[in-house]
Amino acid sequence: MKKDVAAVLLFCLLIVPFFSEDTNPIPNGYGGIELGMPLDEVKDRLMKNSEFGYHGDRDVSLLPGENRILIETDAAAGHVDSFLDRCYFQFYDGRLYIIIININTERVDHYSVFDTLCKKYGNPASLSPEKSVWKNNGVTMSLERPLSLKYVDNKVFDELNSKSLVPKSGTEMTRDMFLEGL
């Protein structure tokens, strides 16, 4: 009996490594730029990293709404030999909460990026023809077609989303009631 238990335990110890995924935590940014950073720090880091093609304050815009700033960079126009194309850095209350990196499709294909992300971070939490999404408590990272990588600070995004909720129209409420009755 003891030999059987020992054999089962040994088998379990040997088989577990084959089924456990050795993945990294989802990153909260790229190229030294991370979600939650203040505006001035992001500007400084963008200046130091030529891969993004940042040209200084002329790339900074104010967005409609309260406390919203956008930095838009263009690595292709910056004559930088980059794997990146246009990148967007969106701020709320002076802190970075969305990073969108458009990847140069002439240099990298969608499948290569998807395969690399799966190997590093495991399988996506959700998958559709349009996008693949990886999530943890603080960050959502999505790979979207044609070839964009997006990082979102979940807490800030949810806060802004709840502030902007518009009541449903009568048609929407009726539709919901119909669907609930099915």
State what each model feature region is.
Residues V60-G78:
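A low-complexity, Ser/Thr/Gly/Pro-enriched, surface-exposed linker/loop concept
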Residues H79-L84:
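A glycine-rich, hydrophobic loop/mini-helix early in the fold
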Residues E21-E66, D93, I98-L182:
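Non-cytosolic coordination micro-motifs
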Residues V5-L14:
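Sec-dependent N-terminal signal peptides
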Residues D85-Q90:
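Hydrophobic/aromatic beta-strand elements that line small-molecule binding cavities or substrate pockets
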Residues V5-A6, L46, I71, F178:
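Sequence-pattern detector for short linear motifs
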Residues I15-F19:
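C-terminal segment of classical bacterial N-terminal signal peptides
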